[in-house]
């Protein structure tokens, strides 16, 4: 059936988010993935994380007494070009839409930092210790910043309005809240298969969004972009009512243990103990299994791991097991496990 193209692909059964209490750094680990899907998803998520998440940034700066960015200010150690470069690194969170204006006014001697900026409304400075410029004794500076929201990187010439007043200096705007993204692909194991992919993403943000949320937003963007390519509805498979009513246990119990891809040693031990179906196996306790000839702790752990992946475990009680027509039921339900 055509739906097996996507229904039978392995999907991650866990995604771990590791932050160690940091708002700006996160490690995301997803496994297992089909071979090759780690690279596919890692590259796609990285590109979207860096280019498509919205954020806030300074778009222009106006300094009292300065007409253009190639000026210098008496008593200020940095020239205007350096000040503009420092302003670009201010990390901002703004919930609403822009543009909005912020002001900083300070007298020397001392250092002007992002924390000296007088914010308005829902604008928050995330790196208040970031240095903008240094003032000597008797120096004074007043700057006004224009802040807006957007996505990606916008160069200064696109922030230059035609009707901008003299002295308004446009700034390159890095709106993306994600600063760095790297990923690596490693092999991981699922059951007896050793070459599935494990995807590890390392994310650094400016603090306006957590790494976990950033990945969620990027995945949602990809989901929306890909949805247009799906030109069919999901096939609905309905089990006959009489079959549902007839079966009093999980159909997976009708699967034979020789289909579990166990090691040869474990499979032979089960065969020698006349354990044919998963339903036979799960009713055995760990102690009973360890009394089986040639069956050791390694085989026990292997079987427990395989059963756990199916939501089962040893020592379960199935009152209606085994059914009288077990072979017929196994054939009837073989496409449901």
From Swiss-Prot:
Record-level GO BP terms: DNA-templated transcription
Region (Alpha C-terminal domain (alpha-CTD)): 249-337
EC number: 2.7.7.6
GO CC annotation terms, alphabetical: cytoplasm; DNA-directed RNA polymerase complex
Residue ranges, annotated region (Alpha N-terminal domain (alpha-NTD)): 1-233
Protein name stated in the entry: DNA-directed RNA polymerase subunit alpha
Catalytic activity: RNA(n) + a ribonucleoside 5'-triphosphate = RNA(n+1) + diphosphate
SMART domains: RPOLD
Keyword match Transcription: yes
């Amino acid at each position: 059936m055509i739906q097996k193209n996507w229904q039978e692909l392995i999907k991650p059964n866990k995604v771990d988010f590791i932050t160690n209490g940091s708002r700006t750094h996160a490690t995301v680990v997803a496994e297992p993935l089909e071979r090759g899907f780690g690279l596919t998803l890692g590259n796609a998520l990285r590109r979207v994380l860096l280019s498509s998440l919205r954020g806030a940034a300074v778009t222009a700066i106006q300094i009292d007494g300065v007409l253009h960015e190639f000026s210098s200010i008496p008593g200020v150690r940095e020239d205007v070009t350096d000040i503009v470069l420092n302003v670009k690194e201010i990390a901002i969170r703004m919930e609403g839409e822009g543009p909005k204006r912020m002001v900083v006014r300070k007298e020397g001697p001392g250092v002007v930092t992002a924390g000296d900026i007088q914010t308005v409304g829902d604008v928050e400075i995330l790196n208040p210790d970031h240095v903008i410029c240094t003032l000597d004794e008797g120096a004074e500076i007043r700057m006004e910043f224009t802040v807006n929201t957007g996505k990606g990187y916008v160069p200064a010439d696109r922030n230059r309005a035609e009707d901008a007043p003299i002295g308004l200096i446009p700034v390159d705007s890095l709106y993306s809240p994600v600063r760095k993204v790297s990923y690596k692909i490693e092999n991981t194991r699922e059951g007896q298969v050793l070459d599935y992919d494990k995807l590890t993403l390392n994310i650094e943000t400016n603090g306006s969004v957590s790494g976990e949320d950033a990945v969620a937003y990027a995945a949602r963007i990809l989901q929306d972009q890909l949805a247009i390519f799906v030109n069919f509805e999901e096939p609905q498979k309905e089990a006959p009512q009489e079959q549902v009513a007839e079966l009093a246990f999980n159909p997976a119990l009708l699967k034979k243990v020789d289909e579990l891809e166990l090691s040869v040693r474990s499979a032979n031990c089960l065969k020698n103990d006349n354990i044919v179906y998963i339903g036979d196996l799960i009713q055995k306790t760990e102690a009973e299994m360890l009394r089986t000839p040639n069956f050791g702790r390694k085989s026990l752990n292997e079987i427990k791991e395989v059963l756990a992946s199916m939501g089962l475990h040893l020592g379960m009680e199935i009152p209606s097991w085994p059914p009288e027509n077990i072979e017929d039921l196994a054939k009837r339900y073989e496409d449901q496990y």
